[in-house]
Amino acid sequence: MSDVEIMAGIMRDRILNLLKEGKRIDGRSFEEYRDIEIKTGFIEKAEGSAWVRLGGTRVLVGIKVDVGEPFPDLPDRGVMTTNVELVPLASPTFEPGPPDERAIELARVIDRGIRESQAVELEKLVIVPGKLVRVVFIDVHVLDHDGNLFDATGLAAMAALMTTKIPKVEYNEETGEIIKLDEYEPLPVKHVPIPVTFAKIGSSIIVDPNLDEETVMDSRLTITTDETGHISAVQKGEGGSFKLEEVMYAIDTALKKADELRKILLEAVGSAS
């Protein structure tokens, strides 16, 4: 057995013993989030951007809006795409190169939560139906990884989208030219989906797992809900399982915690406007 495996076993035993006593390794309650800090307007060249600190986890999101063609099966909708970069300096487990499974999963969960809640009104991003639409790029950069990238990234993505300003445009039918005007308007955002992540360790379920807790968790569950209570994304990770009653508990708790996180987000976005 390697030194890493021995240390992981010791850490798991310590965390399990604390959980049996109703405690967590960092002193939080089972449903308590770490400190959250949200700042917007971090990237000058981007249409929108936000930096989020969740405990020791730090994420930067930039929004770029361009003009392109719609998807053939969605001619009356703008396009939105999410990309994640796990910066090697953020964690010794992150390596340079193409996105790995963790980056792909993170991008899909964030994209699905935003898309399925219809947070961004893509129908309002059409310039010429079937020909030209706005394309929204959500670029995520994980700067420090101390656990729960899903919730930190979800908050950063929404903060960036909600503070995005895009130039108004005019289309010249004769020349086919797109003219950008000096007048700007906010990106049309009508819902605020928030992901809430749970870790199951032994028989205990906790929210917002830190890196130590993620290292020893048996299973992970992320539930994204908007302000109406609509569930727009559910993602299970790791090899363990959740019982039906545990899933129902997670849904109820996700709705409650999402409301709390949404208030923090709206306050941060409001102070930036």
From Swiss-Prot:
Its main location: cytoplasm. Coiled coil: none annotated. It is found in: Cytoplasm. GO terms for molecular function: mRNA 3'-UTR AU-rich region binding. Keywords: Cytoplasm, Exosome. CDD domains: RNase_PH_archRRP42 (cd11365). SUPFAM superfamilies: Ribonuclease PH domain 2-like (SSF55666), Ribosomal protein S5 domain 2-like (SSF54211). GO terms for biological process: rRNA catabolic process. It holds the Pfam family RNase_PH_C. HAMAP family: Exosome_Rrp42. Component of the archaeal exosome complex. Forms a hexameric ring-like arrangement composed of 3 Rrp41-Rrp42 heterodimers. The hexameric ring associates with a trimer of Rrp4 and/or Csl4 subunits. Belongs to the RNase PH family. Rrp42 subfamily. Non-catalytic component of the exosome, which is a complex involved in RNA degradation. Contributes to the structuring of the Rrp41 active site. This is Exosome complex component Rrp42. It comes from Thermococcus gammatolerans (strain DSM 15229 / JCM 11827 / EJ3). The lineage of its organism: Archaea, Methanobacteriati, Methanobacteriota, Thermococci, Thermococcales.
